[in-house]
Regions:
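Non-heme di-metal
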Residues: 1-206
C-alpha cells in the first residue's frame, strides 16, 4: 500500500547507529553509584521489552512470507525488527557505560539500592520468558492484524514517552537516543494502524 511504502521510505531515511551517538559527552563518574545503578535499572527495565522485541518481530516477519503478504508489508516488518535491534543495543551500551559491566543480571551491585533493583530486574526477566512462550503459541493461530493490535497501545505509549524523555533529558547521548527511538516507535505505530485499517473490515466477528 502507499501508506506502508511511505513508512518504509522513512525507515530507510531515518536509520541510525547507536555506536555513532555522542557517548563521549556522558561523564558517568559525576554520578554516585546509587544514581548509576538507578539509571542503569531504568535502562534494564526498558531492555526487558526491547530485548524481546527483535525475536517477536522476526517471528512476525517470517509470518509475512508464510502468508504471502505484499512486498511493502514484508519490508515494514523487517524495518521494525531492525529498529528494535538498535533499541536493544542502545540499552546494552547505556547499561555497560553506567555499570562498567555488560549484563545487569550478573553485575555485582555496589549499593543496597542496587541489590534491590537487581532482584526486581531478575523477576522481570523471568516474566519476559513467560511472555515469549505465550507469543510463540499465538503466532500460528492469529492474523498479523490481530497479533499487533495488542502492540498498538504499547507503540503509542512508547512514541509519547520517548519524545517526552528526549525533551527533558540533560545528557546529550540519551537525548539523541530517545529522539531516535521515539521516531522509530511512531513508525511502528503507523504500521500497526495500517494493517488494522486494511484487515479489520474483512474480519469475521462471529
Amino acid at each position: 500500500t502507499a501508506k506502508l511504502e511511505e513508512v518504509w521510505d522513512s525507515a530507510q531515511r531515518e536509520y541510525w547507529d547507536p555506536k555513532k551517538l555522542p557517548w563521549g559527552t556522558s561523564d558517568v563518574e559525576s554520578y554516585s553509584w546509587e544514581e548509576r545503578e538507578a539509571i542503569a535499572y531504568w535502562w534494564t527495565l526498558l531492555s526487558v521489552f526491547d530485548a524481546s522485541a527483535p525475536p517477536v518481530f522476526a517471528a512476525a516477519f517470517i509470518k509475512t512470507y508464510e502468508m504471502h503478504e505484499e512486498d511493502a508489508v514484508r519490508r515494514c516488518f523487517f524495518s521494525v525488527t531492525r529498529d528494535e535491534q538498535n533499541h536493544e543495543q542502545m540499552c546494552g551500551m547505556a547499561i555497560t557505560r553506567l555499570l562498567g559491566h555488560p549484563d545487569p543480571l550478573t553485575y555485582e551491585p555496589k549499593t543496597e539500592l542496587g541489590r534491590r533493583l537487581q532482584k526486581n530486574a531478575k523477576w522481570l526477566y523471568f516474566n519476559g520468558g513467560r511472555y515469549w512462550t505465550g507469543y510463540k503459541a499465538a503466532v500460528p493461530k492469529y492474523s498479523l492484524a490481530v497479533l499487533f493490535s495488542s502492540f498498538l497501545m504499547g507503540e503509542i505509549a512508547a512514541a509519547t514517552i520517548f519524545h517526552q524523555m528526549a525533551a527533558g533529558c540533560r545528557e546529550p547521548v540519551f537525548q539523541e537516543g530517545f529522539s531516535h527511538i521515539g521516531r522509530d516507535e511512531g513508525r511502528h505505530m503507523a504500521i500497526c494502524m495500517a494493517l488494522m485499517e486494511r484487515d479489520y473490515p474483512k474480519m469475521d466477528l462471529a
